[in-house]
């Protein structure tokens, strides 16, 4: 019975000390489970009875959509985002809203107004961010699967740290309608799951064109493909910036592709040093623009007075860069760099079907450990190129270091999501 499974998860959530959830409405989800059991029309849908957690920056009617900030602490969603409507239409149940870095501004899960999320795979370490609660909820078995958002690695980073699967679809594959955006030209919604097969199913369920999001695209259903004759690229610079212990685990993962019949191709990406400055300059400007609606008049509090340190830092830098005298000096140069980075990245896919490598360059730090902003941003160096270039990218578990999970990142060209998801599934089977 679905209601029994929901009750089991609710009990687990209640007992959990991971702090994965911000808002759970037991009465609401149990009532929805009872209604779902009577709904014969949904019984053959791919997500029938699946219990899904949703990141707190995606609108779900009747739940607190706080973005893990005091700014929106009292804001209750008045509608379902397009992805949530799609989940419900496929027979899924929403169990609650997950914790996250405040306004998705962070890579650790520690900047939330509601307190840090713990990493179920290594309880003394960060789970990664910003989709920290979604990843932790899946890793701690507090739901079947979860939805997160990825602006510069916010699905893939915590998936790697928590030892689960995460997938960032190509830009436009999934509607962003109902997402509280961080940086609209980078943001994409995607799945966090216990295995790669589920990532394929969940991506198919939430993707598709949406009139409410002009960037959204229609794509055929993603199917599993044979990858045995694929050329798999390994970028020297991605490996070079990575901690040796992680690199050793990733090299074992690359051998798995070789054993599957793939040809390994050595590649070079000369723009790796531009990745973080380009990403963050554009991010700051777009985030400053996105936060102007949080003025304390219509709903919530005035963001600059209510937000945490990292969010305020990004707003102030974004405001500074947006001023006319600095726009050309910083922002326009960042846009030019983005164009060059994208051209170079897309060129790599002329030599390879996929690019594989590490997800993060270092292991997650211990909870409460003080890192400078630049040390924190360094977690993103291998994930932001995906968002800058609008390509697709997934993460699967690839070993561990003293019990701390390591994730292998698989990248594909724009709209080659099917290839990446297929490779994730095959890697998992053969690892």
Swiss-Prot record:
Originating species: Methanococcus maripaludis (strain C7 / ATCC BAA-1331)
Keywords of the record: ATP-binding, Ligase, Nucleotide-binding, Protein biosynthesis
The name under which this protein is listed is Glutamyl-tRNA(Gln) amidotransferase subunit A
What would you give as a GO molecular function for this chain, any one? Answer: glutaminyl-tRNA synthase (glutamine-hydrolyzing) activity
**What does UniProt list as catalytic?**
55, 130, 154
Question: What does UniProt give as GO cellular component?
Answer: glutamyl-tRNA(Gln) amidotransferase complex
Output the InterPro entries linked to this UniProt entry.
Answer: Amidase, Amidase_CS, Amidase_dom, AS_sf, GatA
Q: Name one GO biological process term.
A: translation
């Amino acid at each position: 019975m679905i209601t029994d499974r929901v009750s089991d998860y609710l009990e687990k959530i209640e007992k959990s000390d991971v702090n994965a959830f911000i808002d759970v409405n037991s009465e609401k989800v149990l009532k929805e489970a009872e209604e779902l059991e009577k709904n014969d029309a949904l019984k053959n849908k791919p997500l029938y009875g699946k219990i899904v957690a949703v990141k707190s920056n995606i609108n779900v009617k009747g739940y607190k959509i706080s973005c893990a900030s005091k700014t929106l602490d009292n804001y209750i969603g008045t509608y379902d985002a397009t992805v949530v409507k799609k989940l419900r239409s496929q027979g899924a149940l929403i169990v609650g809203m997950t914790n996250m870095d405040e306004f998705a501004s962070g890579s650790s899960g520690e900047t939330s107004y509601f307190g840090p999320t713990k990493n179920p795979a290594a309880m003394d370490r960060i789970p990664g961010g910003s989709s920290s609660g979604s990843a932790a909820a899946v890793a701690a078995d507090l739901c079947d699967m979860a939805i997160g958002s990825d602006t510069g690695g916010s699905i893939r980073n915590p998936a790697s740290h928590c030892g689960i699967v995460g997938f960032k679809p190509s830009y436009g594959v999934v509607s962003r309608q109902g997402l509280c955006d961080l940086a609209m030209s980078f943001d994409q919604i995607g799945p966090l799951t216990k295995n790669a097969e589920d990532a394929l199913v969940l991506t198919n369920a939430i993707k598709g064109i949406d009139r409410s999001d002009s960037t959204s695209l229609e794509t055929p259903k993603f199917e599993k493909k044979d990858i045995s004759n694929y050329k798999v690229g390994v970028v020297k610079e991605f490996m070079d910036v990575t901690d040796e212990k992680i690199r050793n685990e990733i090299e074992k993962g690359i051998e798995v592709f070789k054993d599957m019949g793939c040809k390994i191709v050595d590649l070079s990406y000369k723009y790796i040093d531009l990745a973080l400055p380009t990403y963050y300059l554009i991010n700051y400007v777009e985030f400053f623009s996105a936060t102007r609606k949080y003025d304390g008049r219509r709903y919530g509090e005035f963001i600059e007075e209510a937000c945490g340190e990292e969010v305020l830092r990004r707003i102030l830098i974004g405001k500074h860069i947006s001023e006319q005298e600095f726009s050309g000096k910083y922002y326009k140069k960042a846009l030019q760099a983005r164009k060059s980075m994208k051209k170079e990245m897309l060129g790599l896919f002329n030599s390879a079907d996929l690019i594989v490598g590490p997800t993060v360059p270092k292991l997650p730090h211990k909870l409460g450990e003080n890192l400078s902003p630049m040390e924190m941003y360094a977690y993103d160096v291998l994930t932001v190129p995906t968002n800058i270039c609008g390509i697709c990218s997934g993460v699967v578990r690839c070993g561990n270091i003293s019990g701390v999970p390591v994730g292998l990142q698989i990248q594909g060209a724009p709209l080659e999501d099917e290839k990446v998801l297929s490779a994730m599934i095959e890697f998992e089977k053969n690892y």
